[in-house]
Amino acid sequence: MSIKFFLLVSRQGKVRLAKWFNTLSIKERAKIIRDVSSLVITRKPKMCNFVEYKGEKIVYRRYASLFFVCGIEQDDNELIILEVIHKFVECLDKYFGNVCELDLIFNFEKAYYVMEELLLAGELQESSKTNVLSAVLAGDAESEADAQQDSLQKLVGSVKKR
C-alpha cells in the first residue's frame, strides 16, 4: 500500500492541503490537482468513493465541506485507504476539537504535522491516535518552549542595550 498523494479540497475546488509522496513537476501536480478535484467534486454523494484516473485509483471521502483525496496504485486496497483517511480526520478532530475548514486554513502547518506523524513516505506509520497526538503535542510543547526562550533572550538583549 503506497499513497502517491493526499489532497484536501474544498467544495469550491480550493486546495487546503497537498502532500506528495512521489516526485512530480509543478505542472504535473497542477494538472493532477485540477483533474482530480473536478472529478471528485462533481460526483454525487451516493456514488462510489473510488475512481480510476490515468492508471491509478483515486480514493476520496467527504467530511462536511472538505474532500479528502488519495491517489493510490491500481492494485492497492481502497478500503484500507478509506480507513487511513478516517484515521487522519479523527486525529485532526481530536487535535483541533471538532476540526473545520478554517482550522486547516489558519493552522495548516499543524495539519501537516499530524499527517506526517500518521504517514511516512505514503505508508501508514502509526495507527494509534493516542501516539500520533502525543507526538504532535510534544512537538507543540517543544516549539512553545523555544519561542519563550527566544522572547526571553530578546528581552534580555533589549535591557542590556539600555
UniProtKB/Swiss-Prot annotation:
Compartments where found: Cytoplasm; Nucleus; Cytoplasmic vesicle, Clathrin-coated vesicle membrane; Endosome
Listed CDD domains: AP1_sigma (cd14831)
One annotated GO biological process: retrograde transport, endosome to Golgi
UniProt keyword terms in alphabetical order: Cytoplasm, Cytoplasmic vesicle, Endosome, Golgi apparatus, Membrane, Nucleus, Protein transport, Transport
KO phenotype (gene knockout): Leads to hypersensitivity to valproic acid.
GO terms for MF: clathrin adaptor activity; clathrin binding
GO cellular component: AP-1 adaptor complex; cytosol; endosome; Golgi apparatus; intracellular membrane-bounded organelle; nucleus
Keyword Membrane: yes
Keyword Protein transport: yes
Function: Component of the AP-1 complex which links clathrin to receptors in coated vesicles. Clathrin-associated protein complexes are believed to interact with the cytoplasmic tails of membrane proteins, leading to their selection and concentration.
Family indicated by similarity: Belongs to the adaptor complexes small subunit family.
PANTHER family: ADAPTOR COMPLEXES SMALL SUBUNIT FAMILY
Subunit organization: Adaptor protein complex 1 (AP-1) is a heterotetramer composed of two large adaptins (gamma-type subunit apl4 and beta-type subunit apl2), a medium adaptin (mu-type subunit apm1) and a small adaptin (sigma-type subunit aps1). AP-1 interacts with clathrin.
Protein name: AP-1 complex subunit sigma-1
